[in-house]
């Protein structure tokens, strides 16, 4: 049964040369609240066929009655081009959600660093909207090519001006002459280890990291080199997903202990590996990676079906419901954990 419902475009606002925001409402039907950092899933009927895409919610989670997504126009992105060129105020888009586990830890009390690259700032802006209402110290760090592609800058500047303890730093890779005249950026080039070290006070921060894979890999390695514990870094990719820790530190083939008697076990039958499920991995996909396997994946959120695998024994629980119905004997390993001992054809 489809969980998609139509959302009407009530406003369309160009935020930069490449990014446009769409404000969405559901008429008289209340919209589900969302956690800062979550996204909506869209089925978009482009001239070349229907596509499924995720777009982060970029507005305030306290703005009841409507959602906002901010979409970057991609050269090879049929869905983003369609949204930019053809979708107008009054049109409807089919959406499902909110979804996603990349969310602000609102119960925490540590200072927060929101570190983004390009259109990766969109979930960070939603987080900033929530953080300004509290007392935690927040540093909003954003990197992009220049002022013409810097979306939501005025909004971020207004938010960090609302109370003490909030600040922003914008790094432009190739600032224009106009950027230099207006002086609305703080540094030039890319965020370096030395620069991040100078911006961060000696403290125990929670880091949230979002952007394209090259930016993410560089920033993750830099933060780790500064001694930031990996448990303090939450991240989400904009673009093809990968595993940051594996990219930064290729791991040797792991030692696989013999399964314990009475434990829930996971058997990767084709690989000849059986191991205990201890709960240390956050999903069956993560466990497979811990065992040195390389299953296909992309979204890590139950949406793209890239990780769909055959399960020949046992049951799983989904912590994120699959977007599409699965046939008997199929499982999405990116968003599931074993309920009983399981056998996967991997």
For each of these PLM feature ranges, what is it?
Residues 211, 237, 268-270, 279, ...:
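Active-site proximal loops enriched in glycine and acidic residues that flank catalytic Cys/His/Asp
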Residues 81-258, 262-270, 276:
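FNR/FR-type flavoprotein reductase catalytic core
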Residues 2-92, 109, 144-147, 157-159, ...:
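Ferredoxin-reductase
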Residues 123, 289, 293-317, 327-340:
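Local cysteine-cluster metal-coordination motifs and their immediate loop/turn environment
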Residues 259-303:
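C-terminal accessory/binding modules appended to enzymatic or scaffolding proteins
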């Amino acid at each position: 049964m489809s969980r998609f419902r139509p959302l009407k475009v009530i406003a369309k606002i160009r935020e930069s040369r490449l990014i446009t925001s769409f404000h969405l409402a559901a008429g008289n039907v209340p919209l589900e609240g969302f956690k800062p950092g979550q996204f909506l899933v869209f089925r978009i009927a482009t001239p070349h066929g229907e596509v499924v895409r995720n777009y982060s919610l970029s507005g305030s989670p306290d703005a009841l009655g409507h959602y906002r997504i901010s979409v970057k126009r991609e050269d090879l992105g049929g869905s983003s081009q369609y949204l930019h060129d053809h979708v107008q105020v009054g049109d409807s888009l089919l959406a499902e959600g909110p979804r996603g586990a990349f969310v602000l830890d609102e119960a925490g009390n540590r200072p927060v660093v929101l570190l983004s690259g390009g259109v990766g700032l969109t979930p960070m802006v939603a987080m900033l909207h929530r953080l300004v209402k509290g007392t935690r110290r927040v540093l909003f760090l954003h990197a992009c090519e220049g002022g013409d592609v810097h979306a939501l800058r005025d909004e971020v500047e207004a938010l960090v001006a609302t109370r003490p303890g909030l600040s922003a730093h914008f790094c432009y890779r190739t600032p224009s002459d106009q950027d230099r005249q207006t002086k609305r950026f703080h540094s030039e080039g890319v965020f370096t280890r030395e620069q991040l070290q100078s911006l961060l006070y000696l403290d125990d921060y929670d880091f949230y990291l979002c952007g394209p894979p090259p930016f993410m890999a560089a920033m993750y390695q830099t933060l780790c080199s500064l001694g930031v514990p990996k448990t303090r870094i939450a991240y989400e990719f904009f673009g093809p997903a990968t595993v940051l820790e594996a990219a930064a530190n290729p791991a040797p083939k792991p030692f696989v202990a013999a399964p314990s008697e009475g434990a829930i076990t996971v058997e990767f039958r084709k690989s000849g590996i059986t191991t205990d499920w201890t709960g240390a991995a956050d999903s069956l996909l993560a466990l497979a990676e811990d065992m040195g396997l390389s299953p296909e994946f992309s979204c890590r959120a139950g949406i793209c079906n890239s990780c769909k695998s055959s399960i020949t024994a046992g049951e799983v629980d989904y912590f994120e419901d699959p977007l599409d119905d699965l046939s008997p004997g199929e499982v999405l390993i990116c968003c599931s954990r074993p309920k009983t001992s399981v056998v996967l054809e991997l």
